[in-house]
Amino acid sequence: MKKILLAVLSVIVLLVLFVVCAYTMKWTKITNITDGIKDQIIGKKEEKKKETSEEKIRVATTIKAVESLVKAVGKDKVEIEKVVPDGTEIHEFEPKAQDILKLSNAKMFVYNGDELETWADKAVESVKNKNLKVVELAKGLDKLDVKENDILDDDKDDEHKDKEHDHADDDHKKEKKHEDKDEKKEGHHHHHDGKDPHTWLSLKNAKKYVEKIKESLIEVDSKNKEFYGKNAKQVTEEIDKLYNEYSEKFAKSTKKNFVIGHPALAYLANEFGLKQLSVEDVFGEGTPTIAKMKALVEYCKKHNVKGILTESTANKDVINTVSRETGAKVLPVYIMEDPAESLEYVEAMKKNLETIYGNLN
């Protein structure tokens, strides 16, 4: 009887232990699930908090040069919104509703200047964003007057100087005739009037752009002041290094004139004591006359022109014709107007300077 009772008690104890273990395991599982859900909720909150604290500054930009310098200073703290679509001719661009919307959604709008983005003021006025920080980079800079520097006129100037002492009266008549011709020419090419808008193609101006971008970013995002300052210092040092290197090189160069299609490099040329001569006016709106082409070929041979510079995104047909007739190579330069251009500012300017120097020496 005792044995039977002991066996029954043993079974009861085992059942109790089994129930207790099962309950404990179930509670532990429930606790783990609850803790997991709790951790997920807390994790998401922390992640959201982190995202909010590291929210990028949305910056609307126009040309490639502006975009590139903004990225150089802002790096991963900025998000670029291209107001001007890739492949668009900036001189002909007029913003549509979707382009204006990009300004409305931005914290900053950075553009070159009113000589280039003639539509900027009206676009800003129409934007429903009172907190938009507008930065005109070229504002306050000393701007160059547009000079045609037509390649054939340059040759005539040389001849004029050689014969000046023998033909004063004839030269006066030719000069008057030449001025009249220039007036007609300026009437045809309205885009040559006023100030040269290509201010970013000066390394000295680029440093001023960087400073203005840095100060503007700090104004809208003061907590990252040191970050922007460090990046601005780095890109400024890169620009200084490039300027110093080519100042020495061009100072030793005996040739100072280079031939280009569209005369966009006046600021760069002025900075290094060079002169750009354009073939743009030789062609006008199409194929040049036989007389002009002959004069151009003679000029290139006389001055040993080894290459003709042209914008990397330009139509090559016209320049290729000149190259074929003169034997000069077609050499790409980077104007950095089209947002689609791949090279960043310092790299593009380095290639431009390498190309010009190699062409002159």
Regions found by a protein language model. Give the residues of each.
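Extracytoplasmic metal-acquisition and chelation regions
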Residues: 4-361
